[in-house]
A protein has these predicted regions:
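Long extracytoplasmic/lumenal interhelical loops at the membrane interface
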Residues: 158, 162, 299-360
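Alpha-helical transmembrane segments of multi-pass inner-membrane proteins
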Residues: 131-156, 179-229, 234-247
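A conserved mid-to-late transmembrane alpha helix and its immediate loop/hinge
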Residues: 175, 180, 336, 345-379
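A juxtamembrane structural motif centered on a specific transmembrane helix
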Residues: 1-13, 205, 256-264, 268-272, ...
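Transmembrane alpha-helices of multi-pass inner-membrane enzymes
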Residues: 193-197, 241-242, 388-398, 405-435
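Interfacial loop-to-transmembrane-helix boundary motif in multi-pass membrane proteins
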Residues: 67-75, 113-153
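N-terminal hydrophobic segments of proteins, predominantly signal-anchor/transmembrane helices
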Residues: 13-30, 46-108, 395-399
């Protein structure tokens, strides 16, 4: 009997299934034949809780890192403050008063996912490994996006059996499976930054032409198709390019090393190939032309009109900067977050800073910001050469709030559950001593 797991085809199948599992965590969705409230993130969360309890029973102890406890405490403090704001304002919009539940669901999902990956590989999951899977999941989502857009039977299957936000379909925007609009764009952003980190700091990647080509190719694919899904992806693309420019060269060195010349040559060649393909499809496919013009609207407006702007940026500047209009509103907000609750007041804003302030005041906004700053400091301490990575993740958090009220804790949950560089070194040292 052929051992499927040991064959090349078998390995490819297992890798695809794991990438699908990662995608189901990072881009959660439901099924039409399951209860409406149940999605893939929650399924993985239940799996994670079961595995965690089994590990606790096996080890006869309940253990989690101190930083998870601190992060949980900050999430609970923020939730309590949001609840106080709702009580103070006499509302029942508990969107973020229940944030602590979201914390536990993401942590459970991350723990379950990391347990699956570890079981498949038989070793601890580290940052390079989880970056590979997240990259694969995002490229897979890009493939889903194109299939939904250009293969009718696939779109019909997704629309029939997959339960997800339908806003993208209603707005005639591109979407994948659990991936659409700004929430999908923000997740693309985080992975673009992780790819840049691997290209800049991982010697196994930089010493391998194949790995370098694959990561650069993935970076470009996610940047292009991700922008077709949501132009928020541009933020991650620019931060990733900035990260690579600072760490790999160009930004502070007058003379380039051989490694830098090779890296940027490969990058420019692959970029030229992508541009060539883009120009071909732009000129020969009306639908692709429309998608390219949406994805890079600012560029086209600059070339054609001399204005570096988009329709959404104009709307943000003109109508969406809305702040509290009473003194106590600046402290406690108005206890309203969901769009439907604001319609009666004629208020519509996507801007994260405004929505959080209107919901729970500047105090709540500050608590939420502190929560993500702390999560980033954990990343800086847990992984080698990760200070710049942590800083860029903080910049991403506060940058996306200019456009939308979402967050990136799903990434931090994964990074909390994988092994840190220094922990891995200790395990390797212990294993060497035992041998």
């Amino acid at each position: 009997m052929i051992n499927l797991e040991r064959t090349a085809v078998g390995k490819a199948i297992f890798a695809f299934l794991l990438a699908l599992a990662v995608s189901s965590y990072y881009f959660p969705f439901g099924f039409s034949f399951l209860p409406e409230a149940l999605n893939t993130k929650q399924i993985l969360g239940v799996l994670g809780i079961i595995v965690f309890m089994m590990n606790c029973i096996r080890d006869r102890a309940m253990y989690w890192h101190k930083y998870v406890g601190v992060s949980c405490f900050l999430a609970c403090v923020f939730s309590v403050w949001c609840f106080i704001c709702c009580v103070y304002n006499g509302t029942e919009d508990y969107a973020y008063a229940k944030y602590f539940l979201s914390f536990f669901v993401w942590m459970g999902g991350a723990y379950g996912l990391v347990s699956l990956i570890r079981a498949n590989h038989g070793k601890p999951v580290d940052l390079p490994m989880i970056t590979k899977y997240l990259t694969g999941a995002c490229v897979l989502q890009c493939a889903f996006v194109m299939l939904v857009a250009y293969v009718p039977w696939f779109q019909n299957m997704v629309d029939t059996y997959i339960v997800q936000d339908t806003t993208a379909r209603e707005l005639d925007r591109m979407y994948g499976i659990g991936c659409s609009l700004d929430s999908g764009g923000v997740r693309f952003c985080t992975v673009l930054i992780l790819i840049a980190h691997q290209l800049a700091t991982n010697k196994e990647v930089t010493s391998s032409k194949k790995a370098t080509y694959l990561y650069i190719g993935a970076f470009l694919i996610i940047s292009i198709i991700g922008n077709m899904v949501a132009r928020t992806t541009t933020v991650g693309m620019l931060l990733g390019l900035g990260y690579m420019a600072i760490t790999i060269g160009l930004a502070h060195r007058a003379v380039l090393t051989r490694r830098q010349v090779i890296f940027w040559s490969v990058f420019l060649v692959l970029l030229a190939v992508m541009i060539g393909l883009g120009v071909y499809f732009y000129n020969n496919d009306a639908s692709m032309r429309s998608n390219f013009r949406f994805a890079f609207e600012a560029f086209f407006n600059y070339v054609e009109k001399g204005e570096f702007s988009t329709d959404s940026s104009d709307v943000l500047l003109e109508r969406m900067w809305i702040w509290p209009w009473t003194g106590d509103g600046w402290i406690f907000g108005y206890g309203l977050f969901e769009w439907g609750n604001w319609y009666q007041y004629g208020i519509q804003t996507d801007i994260g800073y405004c929505r959080f302030t209107l919901y729970c005041g500047l105090v709540g906004l500050a608590l939420f910001g502190l929560y993500f700053i702390y999560n980033a400091t954990v990343v800086a301490r847990k992984f080698r050469d990760a200070r710049l990575l942590a800083l860029i993740l903080v910049v991403l958090t506060f940058a996306i709030w200019i456009k939308v009220s979402t967050d990136i804790f799903q990434l931090y949950a994964l990074l909390f559950c994988i092994i840190g560089d220094y922990e891995l070194e200790e395990l390797e040292a212990e294993a060497a001593l035992e041998e």
